[in-house]
Amino acid sequence: MSTATLRETPAAATVTTAPRGLVRTVLRLHRGALWIWLAFVAGTTGFLLWLLGPGAHTAQRALATYGYSGLIRANGSADEYSSLFYYPDTLITLASFAIALFAGGPLIARELESGTAQLAWTQSVSPARWLTAKLAVPAAFIVLGTCLLTAVYRQLWSAHGNLLIAGIGPRSLYFSLGPATVAAPLLGLALGVLVGLAVRRTLPALALSGFAYFLVYAFRGNHWPFQGRYQQPELYSRSRAFTSAGAEIRDPGCYDDKACLAKHDVVRFTREYLPSSDYWPRQLLETGVLLALTAVAVALAFALLRRRAAAG
């Protein structure tokens, strides 16, 4: 009995520690990308906190002194604050693209191209477990980082949304204030992994992963529930103008210049926006669509890996 127990103990220990060892291997192989991601999250969070504190204080003083109209004409502190407010959104979007590139190239295709993955499969690590670790480890850091950024961004919007000139603008900023911000880079990860498994060459996988995510990004920006067009009168910040005949034209930039307004026959202005009541239905549906696409990409990746492994 004692001999049997001694024989069973190492096997049990191997089963317990092998997943941890695989996680450590993924972290070690891609520690450079991990440090870049942590630096991005820390830097973007710091910038958001600056906007939440000192930046907002300066903008509020300028707004109290000059008002919206004066700040726009003078390009004052509140106008600059309104522009800076959107920078983190741009950074988050670029990060999703970068994640797709990383997943397609260094994470998957490079290891398949060099034979590192095949070597791991011969050393008691099944292809399925290898792919699970490749997906789970980056996904965990992506979820933690984007949840933090989304929480701080929402706090910033709740506290100082009044400092944005003419209110909230780009659709992408609305997107960055909710759970879809977490789902988008996960989709980038899944698409990159799928492309990497299909191509198995680093440079082509990089290019195709970026192109695949670009297609998703372009579609997301122009189809319901991802995009809606609503008209609302605005002051000083206008995206479209209407003539007395009802024709819609590009804003000529007249502001309050009556001669300019008369020259272009402009009688009113509108801009595109998403009303608050429409936010959560769209946000949750968008998140669901992105997560569904992520699940499909992951399922296809595992199916492709099984077929490749069976074919040898």
Give names to the regions the model predicted:
Residues 2-12, 31-41, 235-238, 242-308, ...:
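Alpha-helical transmembrane segments of multi-pass membrane transporters/translocases
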Residues 6-11, 42, 46-50, 86-89, ...:
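Secretory targeting signals
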Residues 17-44, 128-139, 200-210:
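Alpha-helical transmembrane segments and their helix-start/interface "positive-inside/aromatic belt" motifs
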Residues 32-68, 91-101, 208-219:
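Hydrophobic alpha-helical transmembrane segments of multi-pass membrane transport/permease proteins
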Residues 57-104, 269-289:
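Membrane-embedded or membrane-proximal helical elements that form or frame transporter/channel pores
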Residues 102-123, 135:
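Transmembrane helix boundary and interhelical loop/hinge segments in multi-pass membrane proteins
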Residues 207-255:
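Aromatic-rich transmembrane-lumenal/periplasmic boundary elements in polytopic membrane proteins
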